[in-house]
C-alpha cells in the first residue's frame, strides 16, 4: 500500500490525460460521438458470435452447442451484472474516501432518474457510453468461458459470468475513470489490455487450473479433439472484424479532431495482426512443416491483444512490430502449457495472458505522447507529451508503472477468480460436470441433442475400430441404465410399495453409488 501511495504522489506532479465520461459531457462529447460509440458497440458485440464459433470449433463435437450457449449466457448474465452494479463500480461517483479504487452510485443504470434538467443530448451520451462499455465487459466473461470448455455445468457458468463482469468493472475503474488510481498515475491502456484481456486471461487460467484437465487429455494416447476447423477460422474472422471497432472506438469520439486517433488505431490494429500473422506463419511452418490452424489463430489473436494497450498511440511501424513480438511470445508459450499439463482448449493463456502482458509493456517502450485533442481546452481534456516511452526519452517511470499495473491487476484477478470458483464449487450448484456427462457430452445431457451428437462424434473420430467401440460402449451403457431404471420403477409401481416419483429418486441414487 505504501508503494501504491508513493507512486500516486509521484504521479500527482506529472501531467496526465484528463477524461471524464459523465460529468463534462456537455463540453466533450457530441451527438456524433454518441453515434460513433453506439455503432461501434454493435460491431463489438459480433465478437461474441466469433468467440462462440471459435470455441465450439476447437472442442469435441459432443460439446459444440454447449459452447455456443455459454457465449449467449455471457451476454445475458454479464450484461445484467453490468447494468445492476458494473457500470456504477466503474464510472460511479469517485468523490469519497475510496474513490480512487472503486466507483459508487449509478447502480441499476437509468439516466432518466438522475435529473429531469439533463438535456436530451446528455442522456443520449450516457446511454451510448453504457452500451459501449457493456460490450467490453461481456467480452471479459467470454474469455473466461473459453478456459472452462467441456468441464463446467451450464448453471454454474451463469454465476461465473455474472461475477467475473463485476471483477472487470472494478479494474476498469482503476484504469479508465478520471479519478481511478492507475489513471491518475498515468497508465497507458487504450482499449482494455489490462481491464479486459488481463482480467479475463488470468481468470480463465485460474479456472482451467481449478477444474483440472479434461478426461484423458494428457493420457498416453490422448489427443486434442477439434470438431470443426472451418468453424473455428470463421469465428476468428468475426473476432478480427470486431477488433477493429474494439480498438478504433476507444477514443470515444470523432469530433474535436479526435477522429485522427481513431484512424491511427484502425491502421495500427490491422498492421499489428498482419505483422503477427507473418511471424505465426513462419513459426508454424518451421516447427511443424505445416500451417497449423490452432497456431495460426492463436498467434494472430495474440497480436491483436498486444495492440490494445497503445493502439491510440502506435505508429504503423510500431504497431507491426508490437504485433509480431506478441505473436512470437504467445507461440513460445505453447510448449509450456503442454509441459505443465495445462488443459487450455482455446489458448486463453498464450493469447490473453501472454498477449496482454506484452501489450501493457509495449507502450512503455514505444509511446510518444504527441498532443491529442480530447475536446476544448477549458474541459482539461488535453493529453501530455512529457511522459513518453523508453525510445523517446521517457525514462523508466512508465515501464515501472505498466509493470506494476500488470502485477496488481493480475493478482487481483487471480484471487477473485479463485474465490468465485471455490464458492460455487462448494455450493449446491456445483462446478464441474460428472464423468458420464463429460464422456457423453454436454450437448446430449444439457440440451438433449443425442442424434446430432453421436453422428458428428463418429465423423470427427473417422470411425476407426477403437473409437467406434468406445462410442458404442458409452451409448449401450447409457441405454442399459435407462432401460433398467424404467423396469425397476415399473416393477415397484406395480407392487404399490413406493410412489413412482420416489422410485425414480431411489433408482438414480443406486446408479450414482455404483459409478
UniProtKB/Swiss-Prot annotation:
It is found in: Membrane. GO terms for cellular component: plasma membrane. The keyword Transmembrane helix applies. The chain crosses the membrane at residues 34-54, 72-92, 124-144, 156-176, 191-211, 226-246, 266-286, 291-311, 321-337, 346-366, 381-401, 404-424. The keyword Cell division does not apply. GO terms for biological process: ammonium homeostasis; ammonium transmembrane transport. It holds the Pfam family Ammonium_transp. Belongs to the ammonia transporter channel (TC 1.A.11.2) family. This is Putative ammonium transporter 2. It comes from Caenorhabditis elegans. The gene is amt-2.
